[in-house]
């Protein structure tokens, strides 16, 4: 299940997640994504599935609000040089909406970063993923948590299989308790713009010294800008 949860967070205030996008199909909530301009959403490549739709402007999954908008993917782009057999390799996907969305009380794009985050930075994560690391408890409204950018060495120690590359971020709380979890995949890591995309992590979530892995958006900016500008053959770092 590609959904990740925010464990140890609290319900997000209604005005802080205007860029958060819900990816879903007929049977389930799949992932989150982030609106980066009126026509484009950024999410994780491992969130791709056949017939998904996107909802923007959602707060409670159960209670519809007048600002909600539904969109379909018009085009989807993943890195052409992504390893097919490695789910976390270049875990980034750009989606062009079938038609643009307008800014509203609950919908607004999030800016891309002008510089990468430094170790120790405090960032926000958010999503509709599981809110218990042991039970299948999913919230109606997205949960938010503050976590820290950690040194790559922490993730390398936690996940020996992980080829810690410069194009990923390691983030969490060393003592555990706050983390992204099942259901949050593809969602944002936010500090001075969209710094990361939820990619993978420990199971169960929120364990001490088992932070999560995030695709480092800053390193993909040239690719993102090329695709949006129409150069669809651009390769990724």
Swiss-Prot record:
Domain Peptidase S1 residues, every copy: 6-229
Activity regulation field: Inhibited by PMSF. The amidolytic activity is also inhibited by benzamidine derivatives.
CDD domains in the cross-refs: Tryp_SPc
Any one GO molecular-function label of the UniProt entry: toxin activity
Enzyme's top EC category: hydrolase
Entry keyword Protease: yes
InterPro entries documented for this protein: Peptidase_S1_PA, Peptidase_S1_PA_chymotrypsin, Peptidase_S1A, Trypsin_dom, TRYPSIN_HIS, TRYPSIN_SER
Subcellular location: Secreted
Annotated disulfide bonds: 12-144, 31-47, 79-236, 123-191, 155-170, 181-205
Keywords, in A-Z order: Disulfide bond, Glycoprotein, Hemostasis impairing toxin, Hydrolase, Platelet aggregation activating toxin, Protease, Secreted, Serine protease, Toxin
Organs and tissues of expression: Expressed by the venom gland.
Additional detail: Negative results: does not have fibrinogen-clotting activity.
Description of how the protein assembles with itself and partners: Monomer.
The name this protein goes by in its record: Platelet-aggregating proteinase PA-BJ
